[in-house]
Amino acid sequence: MKKTLSRLPRVVRLAALSAVLLALCSKSSPLYAFNDWMDANIFFTMGRSMLGGRVLYRDVFDHKGPVLYLLYGLAGLAGGTDFRGVLMLEIIAMTSFLYTGLRTAELLAGRRLSVWWMALPAAGMAASRAFS
């Protein structure tokens, strides 16, 4: 089993770590009955409204930028009315963050590090108040 995991590309292992942690800690996960995050619901509504033909800042209003709404609108296309698409965006963002952190740690250490060194910082971030 260990040999099989070590053959997977590093990004795939980081994505798997991100998916497991976010499935447990993010309210966008199907493991939660509903997502009560006010901002996420606003962004999701704005994005779906924008893709539904409404004009931002005239028909619907919030003070964030249109790129954020576009991302959430695309997530709405992937997941319908639930937050599966948003969870996919979160997994992509966390994987990018972990990969960048791992590469930075490798540059500072001067050697190649195991992907699993990122498990503790990833778990700490996913369990923080940012995901509550």
Q: Where on the chain are the PLM-derived regions?
A:
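Membrane-embedded glycan-lipid processing machinery
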Residues: 60, 64, 75, 85-92, ...
